Amino acid sequence: MSKLYDLVSDYAPSGDQPTAIKQLTEGLDAGLAHQTLLGVTGSGKTFTLANVIAQAQRPAILLAPNKTLAAQLYGEMKAFFPNNAVEYFVSYYDYYQPEAYVPTTDTFIEKDSSVNAHIEQMRLSATKALLERKDAIIVASVSAIYGLGDPEAYLQMMLHIRRGDVMDQRDILRRLAELQYSRNDIAFERGQFRVRGEVIDVFPAESDQDAVRIEMFDDEIDCISVFDPLTGVVKQRDLPRFTIYPKTHYVTPRERILQAIENIKQELRERQTYLRDNNKLLEEQRISQRTQFDIEMMNELGFCSGIENYSRYLSGRAEGEPPPTLFDYLPHDGLLIIDESHVTVPQIGAMYKGDRSRKETLVEYGFRLPSALDNRPLKFEEFEALAPQTIFVSATPGNYELEKSAGEIADQVVRPTGLLDPVLEVRPVATQVDDLLSEIRIRAVKDERVLVTTLTKRMAEDLTEYLHEHDVKVRYLHSDIDTVERVEIIRDLRLGEFDVLVGINLLREGLDMPEVSLVAILDADKEGFLRSERSLIQTIGRAARNLHGKAILYADSITKSMKKAMDETERRREKQQAYNEKMGIQPQALKRNIKDIMELGDITKSRKQKVSKTVPLSKVAEPSLSYNVLTPQQLEKEITKLEAQMYKHAQDLEFELAAQKRDEIEKLRQQFIANS
């Protein structure tokens, strides 16, 4: 049998990787429903998973706990499988405010959102890959458990064109309009088509760089070509057939829309009667007005704002049935891999109840019909029923994963680089600040970095101020810092712009920082979720990528959580040391290009686009920019122009450039105030 996956890597599996790959692959072949990969920080878990997928020869969904880790995972998988369909499926909202009603203040908040067009294209590309190819790897966030269009309706709506078919040009254009493509003969963009004589050009919604040209000879399809929409260069000519996918996952055949409208009218009548009987006349008037407007829009245009609230009728599902999700697109032999499962699994369980609470208020006060409650994420038990064979991946698996795996745990403790887990020390709380200061000075001389984790925001602020007064280059990472700036701060730490990063819940799961040689955990003996066994192991793991990694736990007594975390770290060190001695391995420092890590998740950039080496890395604090003295009118114009550029960069996920523009705008605003 020919291999589906082409795994490209300069390295062969080493350390614990071969054993883990063999165990997981054999488990899949034996039909095990759940397995766990217990992989420590820096042990090459992603490479192990890539090998498992390649050997299993099956499509897979990889779930990550957030967009940052999903982007990192996507970048790594893309590098391992350049010739396969590695796709990215996360929420396409740059900004999302769901509709909500606050009864206490009688405030209705309209739904407001900003959709990232590029991520929308990648989502469509992901479902297309699952429908068309066996070698699909989809890296997704928890967005995968939210309602998506019904796969049956989606497949039914696809437009198949074949060379030699007899089709009236108007029929093709009508079908494209049904797929929600719009005609634009001037600006040709994704999700649009244009007509020039007997030639129809279509820019498929799921494509980022290819468009299709349909050439007609009277009513016959004479030629089908694929071309570059920017240059017009034909890439493939005389294709025998081509399939055009709908512009959105929420398309529905006309007959089903008409049937859905009848069902909505019936439910509206029942709801009106109920509200009148309970003397809720304002709510009855609200629901009538809103629903009738939606019905009119669906009749005329085939869709309406908030059409997902009628998904029960549009998908033909019964009340209470689970909504269609990404898992409905996954073939029956697919795999599910849950990364950082100790975080991701609880996330999946939490989504349903939060969504339900908000919608029940909307239904009660007449803003939505009760059927809107079926537009929801999956319940946890529904997710369990839908999930195919699953591999949980974590350095600290939760009780749920361990229970489900029933002893089927692949231990990946030995790192290919030979690096050991950090050396642990427990020191008294009384002198923790002064002791920490002396440790920081030792690291600063060696050009190494330090992470310090505290229990409270106040303590983190006071400690940062104290260290700053003692001439330590320190920054404080807190909850008010947005994702963009957080990434910049991490990069600046790695570049040596400062030596110490203080925080509360410091990146227990996240990006690699090989420069960090010391992790200091203050008040480690205060039991709680920030000092639980798993939290401590994850925090200690931040120093595991450094040759001289060390973790200091400041405590007056050793708690159960500390004891378990210390025992587990010691177990790992002993196993790693024994392997190194047996194989004659000398631990090697991990060198990872800083720019590579920061660009790993920049998925919106063209694969061909290269970043110039002369472009300086932007920093959290740029040197002061000089501006000529401008009039208030000129300043206003300049601010408007920069804001447009900032939003464009943010839409394209070019967060560093967006932050740069934001800082420029702030300086101009201050200048504007001073001049006014």
UniProtKB/Swiss-Prot annotation:
The keyword Cytoplasm applies. Disulfide bonds: none annotated. Residues 26-414 form the Helicase ATP-binding domain. CDD domains: DEXHc_UvrB, SF2_C_UvrB. It is found in: Cytoplasm. A motif (Beta-hairpin) lies at residues 92-115. One of its GO terms (cellular component) is cytoplasm. Its main location: cytoplasm. ATP binds at residues 39-46. Keywords: ATP-binding, Cytoplasm, DNA damage, DNA excision, DNA repair, Excision nuclease, Nucleotide-binding, SOS response. The beta-hairpin motif is involved in DNA binding. Forms a heterotetramer with UvrA during the search for lesions. Interacts with UvrC in an incision complex. The UvrABC repair system catalyzes the recognition and processing of DNA lesions. A damage recognition complex composed of 2 UvrA and 2 UvrB subunits scans DNA for abnormalities. Upon binding of the UvrA(2)B(2) complex to a putative damaged site, the DNA wraps around one UvrB monomer. DNA wrap is dependent on ATP binding by UvrB and probably causes local melting of the DNA helix, facilitating insertion of UvrB beta-hairpin between the DNA strands. Then UvrB probes one DNA strand for the presence of a lesion. This is UvrABC system protein B.
